[in-house]
Every structure is written in structure tokens, then in C-alpha cells.
């Protein structure tokens, strides 16, 4: 493979990882964006609404280490694909939530999207030499 071809592949992987991270980040904030509507529709208390908003944030933070480890073991492409599928499904079914419990469950899965940063860092680093990783990672996240 030529250097030019390898650079093109690396750039394409960077774009795909960045777009995936952006979409995951949007899904990660989905619950908080719609929290006022959920509160009104389901009659949630302030405390319940706060818990609903906190679940994805906390899970995203806690899941970064395991997601990073999975990325090291199985590769970013597989882990990102599985995560993206789970998050997309959770985001698609959020409107079907009929109870606070269902929303918490969906928020849990959306919280996994917060760990996408750790996946992308390992994935992007793999495609770039050390001299270019700072720039690539700066563009990624």
C-alpha cells in the first residue's frame, strides 16, 4: 500500500469516527434535551427529572474505561458498530416510553453513547503515526 493510499484510509477513518462520535454525543444528550417534555407528559417530580438527566451522564463516564478496554481487545470498528447500533435503537424507541422506568432504561442505553469518546481515541490513534496523533485526536474530539 502506498503512503498516499494509507493517508487516505486514515483520513476516511478519522471522518467516520468523528461523525460517529458526533451522533453518539447528540444521542447522549437526548434525554436532557427532552427532559421538560418528559416531565410534563409523565408528571415527573423535579427529583425524578434530575435522576433521568443524570443517568446517561453518569453511565457515560463510568463506561469509558470498559469501552476503552474492549476497543483495545476487539478494535474500534467492531466496538463502535455495536455501540452505535445499541444507541441508535435506544434513541429510536425513546418516544415509546410510557413510564419513568422505561425512560430510565432507555437513558441507561443512551448513556453508553458517552463512552464513544474512549472508543474513538483508541481507534483514531491506531490509524495515525505518533507525529500526527495530536492533530488527528484534536480533530476527532
Language model feature labels by segment:
Residues 62-101:
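Conserved MFS/SLC helix-loop-helix module at the cytosolic interface between two early adjacent transmembrane helices
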Residues 35, 63-71, 121-124, 133:
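Hydrophobic/aromatic and small-residue hotspots that mark the transmembrane alpha-helices
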Residues 20-21, 25, 91, 99-111:
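Helical-face signature of the major facilitator-like transporter fold
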Residues 106-141:
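Cytoplasmic helix-loop-helix junction between adjacent transmembrane helices
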Residues 29, 57-65, 115:
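Residue-level signature of mid-helix packing/kink "hotspots" within the transmembrane helices
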Residues 12-46, 67:
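Extracytoplasmic
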Residues 13, 76, 132-134:
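Cytoplasm-facing, short amphipathic helices at loop-to-helix transitions on the intracellular side
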Residues 45-53:
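Juxtamembrane helix-start elements in MFS-like secondary transporters
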Amino acid at each position: 500500500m502506498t503512503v498516499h493510499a494509507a493517508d487516505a484510509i486514515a483520513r476516511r477513518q478519522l471522518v467516520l469516527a468523528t461523525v460517529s462520535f458526533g451522533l453518539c454525543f447528540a444521542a447522549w444528550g437526548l434525554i436532557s434535551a427532552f427532559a421538560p417534555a418528559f416531565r410534563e407528559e409523565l408528571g415527573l417530580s423535579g427529583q425524578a427529572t434530575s435522576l433521568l438527566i443524570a443517568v446517561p451522564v453518569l453511565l457515560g463516564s463510568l463506561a469509558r474505561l470498559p469501552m476503552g478496554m474492549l476497543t483495545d481487545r476487539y478494535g474500534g470498528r467492531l466496538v463502535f458498530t455495536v455501540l452505535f447500533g445499541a444507541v441508535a435503537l435506544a434513541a429510536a424507541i425513546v418516544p415509546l416510553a410510557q413510564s419513568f422506568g422505561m425512560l430510565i432504561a432507555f437513558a441507561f442505553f443512551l448513556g453508553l453513547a458517552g463512552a464513544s469518546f474512549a472508543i474513538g481515541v483508541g481507534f483514531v490513534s491506531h490509524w495515525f503515526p505518533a507525529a500526527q496523533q495530536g492533530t488527528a485526536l484534536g480533530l476527532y474530539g
